[in-house]
UniProtKB/Swiss-Prot annotation:
The keyword Metal-binding applies. Belongs to the malic enzymes family. It holds the Pfam family malic. The gene is malS. This is NAD-dependent malic enzyme 3.
Amino acid sequence: MKQFRVTNEGDIQTTLRGLEVLSVPFLNKGVAFTEEERKELGLKGFLPPKVLTIDDQAKRAYEQYSAQPDDLSKNVYLTALHDRNETLFYRLLNDHLGEMLPIVYTPTVGTAIQRYSHEYRKPRGLYLSIDDPDGMKEAFKQYKDQSDTIDLIVATDAEGILGIGDWGVGGIAISIGKLAVYTAAAGIDPSRVLAVVLDAGTNQESLLNDPLYVGNQHSRVRGERYDQFIDDYVALARETFPNALLHWEDFGAKNARSILKRYKDKVCTFNDDIQGTGAVSLAAVLSCAKASKVPLRDHRVVIFGAGTAGIGIAEQLREALVREGLSEEESYKRFWCIDRNGLLTDDMDQLLDFQKPYARSADEVKDYQRNGDGGGIDLLEVVRQAKPTILIGTSTVSGAFTEEIVKEMASHVKRPAILPMSNPTTLSEAKPEDLIEWTEGRALITTGSPFPPVEYNGVTYHIGQANNALVFPGLGLGTIVTKSKLITDGMFEACARAIAGMVNVGVPGAPMLPKVEDLRTVSATVAVEVAKTAMKEGVATEEPEDIIQAVQDAMWYPVYKPIRAI
């Protein structure tokens, strides 16, 4: 499929000529093609005569970006640039990563996904349909004899997009956005990645009734046919790209867990919503434990939102508690998990399999007041009874952490750790400024969405964002460098400890996590620790002597390479 290759010396060779060169985003330099390249590649007359540098182009691109009237327009602009000139896109993103990450990734990508069919301009990645299994085979056949050309595949079925639910084929945009972060943060070569949407239909009524919708316009397929679709995808992906890391993104809760369970011990794969969210949350909790001077093993955790993300966080924290010396039984008893029906208890009907280990004994909570909707035990009552030291929100219920709940928690904890993790900002369980005021500046806060610093009593509180981008780029890079056969639980803990080790929580108002602007440094640090752990745990198939150098050598940078005609 590819009509170009990158040589060992770093330059690019291509068989394409003229307008064909300009149509390939990885090759296109626009007016930065040199005179020699213009002549050799047949570009004379197809470009204005002046040759500019990538610095000039980046300056102009930022002016154009800044002129866009709103965040969605900025996303559309960056998408168009990505589809036109990939190197310039990443140069711009690297120059303004903190500013642009919320545009190419959460939260703005959610709006872009909702508008996908109406803003559609150009395909990118693979669109694999459950209604066309032969078409899926044909798509992978296009990569015949190119088994070493792809290091990373991000796939979604788009049933559980961010906090907005089922958005069908438009979910390809989350795969694309995720890969953009991999490249911007960790230098994963953009020519060696692949975005995939697994279109099994949609249950979103607005899409089913939209004549412009470009995906399968029928209800979501479930059961054996869906499972076979996933199995066929994995088999084809592994057969075609045997060394590729398979990243699962934004599947529905039930499928996300079953797919991960089916494959985690067989292929190099992970689910970012479950394991990535868990790892970045563990990093925040490790920082909170250090700041509060209370050992991790002595904390009590309430999780409000017992879905894929919430239980994923619980699992990462619980495994860390076991490694700190608690028994399996003791570790489960450190968690109180709440869903829409209230505190999970073992007498509840319709508990999901992954929720059952975290359900409290009905006898244990018999004296709790059942004042929630439907007779359940609500968050306030759980906080009163459990006296948590850590409160985590993954519910997408805006304002769920009320003043009464927060003050109740703060009345029995010197430094309450409060993590409203839901995205986007409008769905956050609480605002940092309120949490700081209600706790008189004592709260240790980490949020899922970006929030500005808060001034209180002469102290500036910087709010750490528990963005999965702190985890998955470095995890991917470390995995690729070592060509790991699997991704282990130990590799995720290595991510968390590396991230937590990069902040100085002793400074008043310090964030519990590194800044998003420092993602490049964070990702390199995480990659080194992941690689070390992969080698230690015996899943690495390549073991570089100098891991730091190997990680640096593997990182792609957005600079124009010489292009030669062949």
